[in-house]
Amino acid sequence: MPQEVIKKNHMDVAWHEYTDENGGNVPVVDSSIAEKASVIGRVGIMFLSCGTGAWRVRSSMNTLAEALGITCTADIGLMSIEYTCYDGENGFTQSLCLTNTGVNTLKLNRLEHFIRNFEKEGKHMSGEQLHTFLDNIEKTHGLYSPPALGLAAAIACCGFTFLLGGGPIEMFCAFVGAGIGNYLRCKLTKHHFTLFLCIVSSVSLACFAYAGLLKLGEILFGISVQHEAGYICAMLFIIPGFPFITSGIDLAKLDMRSGIERLTYALIVILVATMSAWIMALILHLKPVDFIKLSLSTEQWILFRLLASFCGVFGFSVMFNSPVRLAVAAAGIGAVANTLRLELVDLANIPPAAAAFIGALTAGLLASLLKNKVGYPRISVTVPSIVIMVPGLYLYRGFYNLGIMSLSVAASWFASAILIIAALPLGLIFARILTDKAFRYCT
């Protein structure tokens, strides 16, 4: 029986057909506006596919347009770009779309190098040569296999569990649950399954694995049922920290369309993930009770929080397809910034939202200092370093209490989460304003 072929909902763009006749020998700077615009648009949509915000996408398109002697205006969203190029006599307008969204910091870095070298090298290449070069960049897929990404999620959620107050038992169960859950998500994503299926399947499996391990420990070793408090930590790999934070940055630059679309996407993921976890909790009879308190001194808390924050940020960076060197840099910044945030809450009684702002500001300033040494785009370091500060547990507890109609408790959790989520991009934005002259002005 012949296998049914699924037709793509978004047709592929034949980029090489935009090159002029005999265009293989003519520098793109001397080619037609259609050929120039095809290069600009393709680079823009490739930047967008990496998960970066509208301001950075437009900046890269402007750099190419200036080098090619034309003007470009672009309207950028989460999944699409509509842009027009002018050369004084003619105009060329095009609409481009992605089939899915995600984060790929390695591809983003390669595109950044392409933009930096375009003035000296790129504009003297032909359109055909440029599209061939971009073909190679576009093939930049994941550095890591699904098992490796499962391990990264396991490490990240294990660290996350300790930072939220969990002990060794919760950390181990979350490690296994998150690893299995993210492995399944990666396999489903690789086969291009739809977003909702990937979220529901991976979250359900992660919660089921946590509950299964806990029940096994209860039977074999008499483990207390109160350790169920950490089951939600097993699904925190699904929290869309990158679009949450980039939406705030886009809104700060008045890129309203991109900011609102990114925020909507993040809220959709949160809604589906928390609803899936809530239903699993009802099936498995799990409740988001408080963690059993750990007896640690202040010095021990600081040391272990540094270590857990490092592991958490490192895991999330790997999940964003960051090379190990970049992941280590982000993890170092995240360890300092997140530990500072937590200690400000514990030792100085600063409200969590204010502490989140200070932590994000610190991460942004440290990333600016290390930007030239690391050699990677700033956003590849800053966003992963503060993703661990996104209050996924607060969001889940808010939804759980909403589901059981404890409306006042739900409102309290949601309010706390919203304040922290608002504070995180604000911290990065002010760090960028202080350290980046181009970002400081409305141009």
Segments predicted by a language model, with ranges:
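Hydrophobic, membrane-facing alpha-helical anchors
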Residues: 118-132, 147-157, 175-185, 281-288, ...
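Core alpha-helical transmembrane segments of integral membrane proteins
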Residues: 143-246, 319-320, 324, 329
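C-terminal transmembrane helix-loop-helix hairpin of multi-pass membrane proteins
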Residues: 230-235, 246-250, 254-270, 332-443
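Structural signature of hydrophobic alpha-helical transmembrane segments
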Residues: 163-177, 226-240, 292-308, 348-362, ...
